[in-house]
């Protein structure tokens, strides 16, 4: 009864200072760019960059060097979460979100404008790595700020629904990235694509950045942060406070995100690689056919994100996430061999649709759950840090571990790996308290 009364009192005090539509667009635009960038960079790192930015000789070495630049962003992201989290918790959410979007956007456009190895030699891969590091820094501060923008401007009883707005950017970005590559494959020859066509998606992201900046600049500061600022309760070093006074919830938040990241990268990067690789290594399906399957399956992802937010508001974050994580474990144990391993396009699509729909369900509540674990004075840093450390543990290595397990132990071992990661998330959830009724 105490928690309910607190919630109702808080709701009576709630007065929106930013329109719902502005909050929606401003919070999802950054994650849309993030996932758009993820997929276009991952694709270009395999297909284009080894030929453009690295000396020609050993093609395998060039591909590995190119993929290493992809991994740089995962190292940069926790650094970005600490840097942008520091200013987000001390200066304000609005200014920091503008800065993170600018950092991410400028770095992405720069990649699309970089000259190749044939033009500037060794400076080409160095500048590519630097731009990728800049992307990672911006990304490190993006999601946490977007989640706070949504949840700190939300009516208390709709906090998880509002908190799902940033997660909607993921399927939107992924859908447009896939669509862009399909469109380019229809309109351009291979020679045109390798010459200049690959640059189009990177430069096009500038449009999204401009829209995002326009909306974010017009927002008012979060009312929750303004209370802390007026009371002068900001801490001097948010990361230091986080790692000394809030270690337990930081670790729990990281492991709560683990299954989400592992599931997404297995369903997208690994499944794409396995489905298109020639037999006996993979299924040998046409690349464009798999891209279409992923685009259609991502619709299920997008639909489930707000559904998950509604469920988390109705039944609580912890309870709904425990059920969803259990479903991920069952999917991991029983779906890989019969569906993905069948090689039948209909069953492969069913696998992708099921997995990405579960991704929407597990990702949807995160925008409320992670921020609610932390007090206002370290919330930006805490939510961002947990989210981005989980990206190293669950995202950066997942496709490689999955490929190694499949090669050495078969497809079922990939499912066991996903089930194990989801099991760690389930334990973290069981050790976490319910946060639905608490005030921010």
From Swiss-Prot:
Name of the protein in its database record: Inner membrane metabolite transport protein YhjE
Superkingdom field: Bacteria
Periplasmic compartment residues: 56-66, 189-192, 270-289, 342-345, 406-410
SUPFAM superfamilies in alphabetical order: MFS general substrate transporter (SSF103473)
This protein's record includes keyword Transmembrane: yes
Coiled-coil positions: none
Primary residence: membrane
Family statement drawn from the similarity comment of this UniProt entry: Belongs to the major facilitator superfamily. Metabolite:H+ Symporter (MHS) family (TC 2.A.1.6) family.
Cytoplasmic side: 1-34, 88-108, 151-167, 214-248, 311-320, 367-384, 432-440
Keywords, comma-separated and alphabetical: Cell inner membrane, Cell membrane, Membrane, Transmembrane, Transmembrane helix, Transport
One GO MF term attached to the UniProt entry: transmembrane transporter activity
TM region positions: 35-55, 67-87, 109-129, 130-150, 168-188, 193-213, 249-269, 290-310, 321-341, 346-366, 385-405, 411-431
Topology with respect to the bilayer: Multi-pass membrane protein
One of the Pfam families matching this protein, by short name: MFS_1
Subcellular location(s) of the protein: Cell inner membrane
GO CC field: plasma membrane
């Amino acid at each position: 009864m105490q928690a309910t009364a607190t919630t109702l009192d808080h709701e009576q005090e709630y007065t929106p200072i930013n329109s719902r539509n502005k909050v929606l667009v401003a919070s999802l635009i950054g994650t849309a760019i993030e996932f758009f960038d993820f997929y276009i960079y991952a694709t270009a790192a395999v297909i284009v960059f080894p030929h453009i930015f690295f000396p020609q000789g050993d093609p395998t070495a060039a591909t590995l060097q190119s993929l290493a630049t992809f991994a740089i962003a995962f190292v940069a992201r926790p650094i970005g979460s600490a840097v942008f989290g520091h200013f987000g918790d001390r200066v304000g959410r609005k200014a920091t979100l503008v800065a993170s979007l600018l950092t991410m956007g400028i770095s992405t456009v720069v990649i699309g404008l970089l000259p190749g190895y044939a033009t500037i030699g060794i400076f080409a891969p160095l500048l590519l790595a630097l731009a990728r590091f800049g992307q990672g820094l911006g990304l490190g501060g993006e999601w946490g700020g977007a989640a706070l923008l949504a949840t700190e401007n939300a009516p208390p009883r709709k906090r998880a629904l509002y908190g799902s707005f940033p997660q909607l950017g993921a399927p939107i970005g992924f859908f447009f990235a896939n669509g862009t590559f399909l469109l380019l494959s229809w309109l351009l020859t291979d020679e045109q694509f390798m010459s200049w066509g690959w640059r189009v998606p990177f430069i096009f992201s500038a449009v999204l950045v401009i829209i995002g900046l326009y909306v974010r600049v017009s927002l008012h500061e979060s009312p929750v942060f303004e209370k802390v600022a007026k009371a002068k309760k900001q801490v001097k070093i948010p990361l230091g406070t986080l790692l000394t006074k809030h270690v337990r919830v930081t670790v729990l938040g990281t492991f709560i995100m683990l299954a989400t990241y592992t599931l997404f990268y297995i369903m997208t990067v690994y499944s794409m690689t396995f489905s298109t690789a020639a037999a006996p290594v993979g299924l040998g399906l046409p690349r464009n056919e798999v891209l279409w399957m992923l685009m259609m399956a991502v619709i299920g992802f997008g639909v489930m994100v707000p559904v998950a937010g509604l469920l988390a508001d109705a039944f609580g974050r912890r309870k709904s996430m425990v059920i969803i994580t259990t479903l991920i474990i069952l999917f991991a144990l029983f779906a890989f061999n019969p569906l993905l391993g069948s090689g039948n396009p209909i069953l492969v699509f069913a696998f992708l649709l099921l997995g990405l729909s579960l991704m929407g369900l597990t990702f949807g509540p995160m925008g409320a759950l992670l921020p609610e674990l932390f007090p206002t004075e370290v919330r930006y840093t805490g939510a961002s840090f947990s989210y981005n450390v989980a990206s190293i543990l669950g995202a950066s290595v997942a496709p490689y571990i999955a490929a190694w397990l499949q090669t050495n132990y078969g497809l079922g071992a990939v499912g066991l790996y996903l089930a194990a990661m989801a099991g760690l998330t389930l334990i973290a959830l069981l050790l976490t308290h319910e946060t639905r009724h608490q005030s921010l």
